[in-house]
Design a protein with these regions (language model features):
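Sec-dependent N-terminal signal peptides
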Residues: 6-14
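Boundary at the C-terminal end of the N-terminal hydrophobic targeting segment
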Residues: 19-22
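Short proline/glycine-enriched turn/loop segments at secondary-structure junctions
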Residues: 204-208, 234-241, 299
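Short, structured beta-strand segments at or near domain termini in extracellular proteins/domains
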Residues: 243-256
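Functional-site microenvironments in short loops/helix caps that host divalent-cation chemistry
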Residues: 32-33, 39-47, 84-231
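Positively charged n-region of N-terminal signal peptides that target proteins for export
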Residues: 1-4
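A short glycine-rich, aromatic-capped structural motif
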Residues: 24-85, 105, 184
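Asp-box/BNR beta-propeller blade signature and adjacent active/binding-site loops
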Residues: 260-433
Length: 433
């Protein structure tokens, strides 16, 4: 047997195919992922409720996945300007470290650039393709069992300040499909819009037709190890980018599966304009009215620690309150809930979930109703992970008294101190909030 034949036989035996893409430039190596099926999700207690229900998924066609996350050198063959971000906050300065500070649109653009260059179809993996490739035939918490090997751990805890770690790819053993760093190193963007799972067998699912957040998977450095599980779901505003997230790619046609229709549900809210009565200047005193009223039925858990409220009025005469609900003020489970005191009512509605970037701390909310337009503004912090120190700032608006809300926009994109808002938003004479 000559050397070439022996090399080819070894590749087939290992179930992977090493090839080159994006020449000239750093080689991207791919592994062959066979068609098959698996059980997606987990039992999902508590904060992991979005991993339920467990459901059977068929991946009907084989595909090829990059054996590592895309590196700085590989990404910068497409976007040389990214080199200025190497070493930001102390992370990822080397050619062979995973690229970070890349948003979903940039990751998607890299795939389209490479596709055009090579005459093949490269794209981000769907969430189902990602979990199937990560599990590689396993059914435990991780592809290696219920614990990760020590070599795969990179500062698996959270801190209020940045603690740099080496993000060089492929420094620990691959999974059974030959893929490195599927648990940790950096989070990885997926193709899908984030949304709840549903029951029933599925074939080649592609997620939702629209949404607020794009799925990320795999967890990262500087993250508690439970967020690195095969089933763990995370997501981000697609324009967000930070030191925890990068991506890997697959070579495969875009799935023909139809996406799940996006939810168009709106809260039933009166849309009349209230007539406000002048009550003169006499002070009035009322006993407090409880506004944190847990719902009897909810698709998301409400936690015991409810704090940091903000309240505003609505043009229809309602009062609207928001606050965070969490187990720990440093926790990634933190979510923004809200309630309404309807015009003329003497008790608040049951609370309901308003805003949740999956697996991100969301400390700090502020509300304001513009007296001229009736538009309601919500400003809220969003962390890269846990804690509440390095927040970016997102904004949403409502033009129908809080019945529906706009897509979140990042208005202060840097995850840095100084972006924790609290109640008391004002408008300056120049119109600034």
């Amino acid at each position: 047997m000559n050397r070439k034949t022996l090399f080819t036989a070894l590749l087939l035996l290992l179930g992977r195919n090493v090839c080159s893409a994006g020449e000239p430039g750093p080689t991207i190596r791919f592994a062959e992922i066979p068609a098959g099926w698996f059980y997606m999700g987990s039992g999902g207690p508590g904060a992991d409720y979005d991993e339920t229900p467990i459901h059977k998924v068929v991946i009907s066609r084989p595909f090829r996945m990059s054996v590592t996350e895309i590196t700085n050198a590989q990404y910068e063959a497409f976007d040389p300007s990214h080199r200025a971000l190497r070493g930001k906050q102390g992370f990822s300065s080397g050619d062979n470290e995973a690229v970070i500070f890349v948003d979903w649109h940039q990751a998607d653009a890299f795939c389209r650039w490479l596709s055009e260059k090579e005459g093949r179809t490269y794209r981000l993996p769907t969430e189902a393709e990602w979990e199937y490739a990560c599990r590689a035939g396993s059914c435990m918490h991780y592809s290696f069992g219920d614990r990760l090997p020590k070599a795969a751990l990179k500062n698996q805890e959270e801190h209020h300040s940045f603690i740099p770690v080496d993000l060089t790819v492929a420094q620990s053993a691959p999974n059974a499909f030959g893929l490195y760093d599927m648990h940790g190193n950096v989070e990885e963007w997926c193709y899908d819009w984030y949304g709840p799972y549903f029951r029933g067998d599925q074939t080649d699912p592609v997620g939702y037709a629209d949404g607020f957040y794009k799925v990320t998977r795999g967890g990262s450095h500087s993250t508690p190890v439970e967020y690195l599980r095969s089933a763990n779901r995370m997501a981000m505003i697609p324009e967000d980018k930070h030191f925890l997230t990068g991506f890997r790619i697959i070579e495969a046609p875009y799935p023909a599966t139809k996406p799940v229709p996006a939810s168009t549900a709106a809260e039933p809210v009166a849309q009349h304009v209230a007539h406000w009565v002048d009550m003169n200047d006499q002070p009035r005193y009322y006993t407090p009215i409880e506004y944190v009223i847990p719902p009897q039925i909810s698709t998301a858990p409400m936690y015991p620690h409810n704090h940091c409220p903000a309240v505003t009025w609505c043009r229809n005469g309602d009062l609207l309150a928001v606050w965070f609900s969490t187990i720990s003020e440093f926790g990634r489970e933190m979510a923004i809930w809200h309630s309404r005191l309807r015009c003329g009512a003497d008790s608040w509605d049951e609370a309901s979930l308003l805003c949740k970037v999956p697996d991100r701390n969301m400390t700090g909310s502020s509300l304001r109703c513009d007296p001229d337009s009736g538009r309601i503004y919500l400003l809220n912090g969003v962390e890269a992970g846990g804690w509440w120190r390095n927040l970016a700032l997102l904004a949403q608006t409502s033009d129908d008294n809080g019945a529906t809300w706009s897509r979140p926009q990042i208005v202060s994109p840097e995850h840095t101190p100084g972006h924790q808002v609290i109640a008391g938003m004002i408008r300056s004479s120049e119109g600034w909030l």
